[in-house]
Amino acid sequence: MAYLERASPTLKETLLKIYRAEKPIEVDQHFHEFGSIEYHIKYSVSDPNIVHVSTSTLLETQGAVTLKEISSYTYEVIKNIGVGVIDIVDPPRLGFQLTLGLNLDNIPRGKEAIKIITRISELQAIILSSQLKEMLRSLNFQDDSRSINNMPIRIVYHPSEPFYVFKQPEKITAVFPMNFKDNSDVVIATSFFQELVEVGSQKDMGKAPQCSWSPIPPLQLRGEPVQDLTTNSGFVSFDITSRHIEGKRLDKTVWNLLNFYACAKYHIKCSRGYIQRRMRKRMETLVKLLNNTSLEEEAAQNENGRCKYVKEFVKVPKGKLMMKQRCKEMTRRVKISKFRIKINGCARFRFNQRWISLPKFSSKPSDKSYTKLD
């Protein structure tokens, strides 16, 4: 998949290293970028004036339009990067899509050299953009009466990031199935896409392609591979009209489509990092407050000594004090009543509303007590 920076970092670094070397160095480097873009750089001491750069893209398309080779228009754009500097090698290196021969002697010195090398490092961005441009042009000028032209085109620039383009009346729709590994990223992405749709519907964004999000795939994608239609973050669609692919707008539209996956993932990762930083900062603030509170309590204990514990022992909470008073009052009433017991069953004996007192027993003998006779 294309990325936010047009220039390949590894390709640019290697070419600058070869260009700035005081003596020719042997270079035979083979590397991949983003899983689908392949490069090979060959520089030999025996031929110090020529650097061979080969590149290839995993371009898979299914549908009404299929591009397997680089067009003549793309060749002209590549040659115009540096007139007299770039030669296209025919046939290309085995297993690659394009091979360029760079003449180091024809590269101008100073800042212009860095500019040309940077443009050469944008080779894959130029190829990918040109291929997608031709697809959009071919779809735009097709006849709507032919039903086969409305079939979706599956475009794969990265094995795990395919997207679809299909023709509709007066517009072209690009659909991006979105998948994320982390559950937190899924939550952030879902909220982000819904917010994107809401912002895109405002009047200020009337010139931009209309954006829509749905948790289920569009009807036009029926019959496509199940792995593409199984997502955890839904499907994002952009409606591209004829005004978006006219003149210089075509370059911007194509580049935005190629970089949508990269932009979305970049935004979500940044949002996740921001949330984590805020949570960490909040946690540090709470811990600091707790530490300050414990330090203040220890300082107060050291100043007051034992007085604090005496005050705490004497001080009684208001609720407990009221309960204690009620208990005292109840005890006083019980003592006054002399343990009188009310018997409701004696009402028929005219003892209604009367009280029977329990006799008092004493362990000391009295004068009225009985004496056992011998």
Curated annotation (Swiss-Prot):
> Subunit structure of this entry?
Component of the Arp2/3 complex composed of ARP2, ARP3, ARPC1/p41-ARC, ARPC2/p34-ARC, ARPC3/p21-ARC, ARPC4/p20-ARC and ARPC5/p16-ARC.
Record lineage? Eukaryota, Viridiplantae, Streptophyta, Embryophyta, Tracheophyta
What does UniProt give as GO cellular component?
Answer: Arp2/3 protein complex; cell projection; cytoplasm
The cysteines covalently paired via disulfide bonds are: none
Q: In which tissues is it expressed?
A: Expressed at low levels in all tissues with a relatively highest expression in inflorescences.
Q: Name one Pfam family in it.
A: P34-Arc
Per the UniProt entry, the signal peptide is none
Q: What is its main location?
A: cytoplasm
Per the record's keyword annotation, is Cytoplasm included, yes or no? yes
Keywords linked to the UniProt accession: Actin-binding, Cell projection, Cytoplasm, Cytoskeleton
Q: Which GO terms describe its biological process?
A: actin filament organization; actin filament polymerization; Arp2/3 complex-mediated actin nucleation
Record-stated family = Belongs to the ARPC2 family.
Gene that produces this protein:
ARPC2B
Q: Does the keyword Methyltransferase apply?
A: no
Protein name according to UniProt? Actin-related protein 2/3 complex subunit 2B
